[in-house]
């Protein structure tokens, strides 16, 4: 805020200030984590000087990591493509798109806490051969994700004008958001809550190969083509967000099917039974 608008005695740098602030926050966060790792007693067992490379244990981590890297790359790549399509529609469209996207992330990132909990608990229960407990816990978290998403959706609808005013004073941008985009974001919050929880549950079960292929098909095979059509066929911003909805619907259907098929319960054993890393 200070670097963008020049408050608190700081220079007014605009977009450059936002970049500096974001980079500074990342550096501070990294320094804090490194400090905890190297100097905290609770991390003494994990010091670098005590590490030993085990190829037997490294191979499953490499497989899981590559699956998730491809999955995340497909998701981020499709989102970048959609943003580029919005940018080609004009500055107002791009602004409205980014505001809507940040609102979607606000709800999703909060709900992601449930996904991380599910990831850890699924890994724990499957590692101790408690498949039924893992499945029951997963169903509970799915319901929690849906309720949390519903709360965010209602909040977005109820405070739509106030929320939009916090982001912009532009009449054009407000009209674009009020033409159905905010409604679209709000309606998909319960769906997003379920999808994010399912994502965490399946990562905890090391079912990453399925997640990779589902995202490749959904992101590159569904979302990207719809975004392209929105740009070239005159569908506008609502066309891009129809693509977002199609992607999330695809993820909901495929991940629900995978979870309730229960084939994921064997994936962790096949990958060595090692607990997966926290989601990013």
Residue ranges and their predicted role:
Residues 25-29, 33, 37, 55-117, ...:
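Transmembrane helical elements of multi-pass membrane transporters/channels
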Residues 102-103, 216-225:
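Small-residue-enriched core segments of transmembrane alpha-helices in multipass membrane transport
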Residues 10-66, 122-188, 229-280:
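Short alpha-helical transmembrane segments in multi-pass integral membrane proteins
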Residues 1-13, 73-106, 124, 164-171, ...:
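Helix-terminus/linker motif at the lipid-water interface of multi-pass membrane proteins
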